[in-house]
Amino acid sequence: MTDTLQAIARALSTDVQTLGTISHNVANMNTPGYRGVRAVPEFSQQALLRTSLDQTDGSVMQTARKLDLALQGPGFFVVEREGEPLLVRSGAFRVDAQGQLVTANGDLVRGPNAPIGTDLDALRVDADGALWNGTQSLGQLELITVADAGALRPAGGGAYRYEGEQGPWSGQVIQGALEAANIDAAGETIRLMETTRHAESVQRAISIYDKAMDTGINRLGDN
């Protein structure tokens, strides 16, 4: 493959990856706690782009539901799936059959040191993540920040794997609310139009290159 064709192929591959992130963002615009994905340059031989999460807070939607918790400020809830620690941003929690606090996907929320139970009238979650049933302490939600959002890897069910450096959490928990996805619909539409136009221009360049190569080969044949 010639240098010219390699450059064109890389440009088209980059556009395809970018369109994939835009599609994923648009599909999750109504998913609580969803973090927008951005494709950023990756200067390596293995990949042209890598994905990074937009850490901007989404707007807070009041639900008045006791087990809905919104985070404000950078950071994640720590949950557990089959013994593996994972991170989630969505606080749409529920109580399972054992009285444990779990995500909508069934992952155990780390922090509570006693069953939450089904009587939620007296359940209180403080801004620092402390859990209370009336005056009885139920523990402290495990909350962390990540040093490198680019190292977060999707684990399914709105969760992420992370093996990088962690930091203390200093944000705020809001009970009875959910964080909306931090997706700007207008911004995604503009990105879609720009990337689509660029991909179309790359495809035209491929067509021009093919015609030029065919012409050159035919001339060689005539000689």
What residue spans do the PLM features occupy?
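Amphipathic alpha-helical polymerization modules
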Residues: 1-223
